[in-house]
Amino acid sequence: MNALNQAHCEACRADAPKVSDDELAELILQIPDWNIEVRDGHMELERVFLFKNFKHALAFTNAIGEIAEAEGHHPGLLTEWGKVTVTWWSHSIKGLHRNDFIMCARTDEVAKTAEGRK
């Protein structure tokens, strides 16, 4: 476990600062399986999780939904047969906040015990 998966999200307002380049370089090392994607001019963190079937993929999606609700920070989720794509970014600041890295780490923790992972 790392410090990120033990942390909790803080309220993120529209005027909250995005992570700096230095923070980005440090934080991304703590979530090595995630990719930075640029969409609509802003950075997002994305990872694809593979499962044996749709039932397991849906259960994982619901588990991520539970932690998202608990933290008040919500990802993009695409659930397909045997696959879930999870995308974290801070909508209010149109970019990456420390909260997104926390939620990536928390997602990784859920994935470790998710049934039906490939």
UniProtKB/Swiss-Prot annotation:
The keyword Manganese does not apply. GO terms for molecular function: 4-alpha-hydroxytetrahydrobiopterin dehydratase activity. One of its GO terms (biological process) is tetrahydrobiopterin biosynthetic process. It catalyses: (4aS,6R)-4a-hydroxy-L-erythro-5,6,7,8-tetrahydrobiopterin = (6R)-L-erythro-6,7-dihydrobiopterin + H2O. This is Putative pterin-4-alpha-carbinolamine dehydratase. The keyword Lyase applies. Its EC number is 4.2.1.96. Belongs to the pterin-4-alpha-carbinolamine dehydratase family.
